[in-house]
Amino acid sequence: MIIERLVGNLRDLNPLDFNVDHVDLEWFETRKKIARFKTRQGKDIAIRLKDAPKLGLSQGDILFKEEKEIIAVNILDSEVIHIQAKSVAEVAKICYEIGNRHAALYYGESQFEFKTPFEKPTLALLEKLGVQNRVLSSKLDSKERLTVSMPHSEPNFKVSLASDFKVVMK
């Protein structure tokens, strides 16, 4: 089965009205536009998203829906650094330092709380900066993602030369 577009999200439906099968994804797999996965019930699916969400697949995104059958995304819990800022200045410092490392940054559960995937160097940096943090297991859902940039990604557009293209040497 080839999935080329999203059909909706489980939060907009009553999941009890459907037979829901899930594709379990790690947080870093949610940004893939082309991939192969197996659902919990053993169905092979290929994803080739034409208009992939800019931030990636989110928890509950519906990949397939036919009558009462649904295949939806489940983002697995992973080891995450939960960061609690004490002030707006500390928020700026956190965003700068995490962004400087090109690490993913997500909104947390409350104001001034953020999440980033666990990496020892990031944890050491936060400790050095005196930023309150703790390592927990939780979901990193794309809809909560702050950073949009994606290193080493392929562009989502085609490049072609215009018929009137000219190179001028001066």
UniProtKB/Swiss-Prot annotation:
Gene, per the UniProt record: ureE
Subcellular location: Cytoplasm
Any GO molecular function: nickel cation binding
HAMAP family: UreE (MF_00822)
GO annotation, cellular component aspect: cytoplasm
Function: Involved in urease metallocenter assembly. Binds nickel. Probably functions as a nickel donor during metallocenter assembly.
Record-linked Gene3D superfamilies: Urease metallochaperone UreE, N-terminal domain, UreE, C-terminal domain
Assigned protein family: Belongs to the UreE family.
Protein name as annotated: Urease accessory protein UreE
UniProt entry keywords in alphabetical sequence: Chaperone, Cytoplasm, Nickel, Nickel insertion
GO biological process: protein folding; protein-containing complex assembly; urea metabolic process
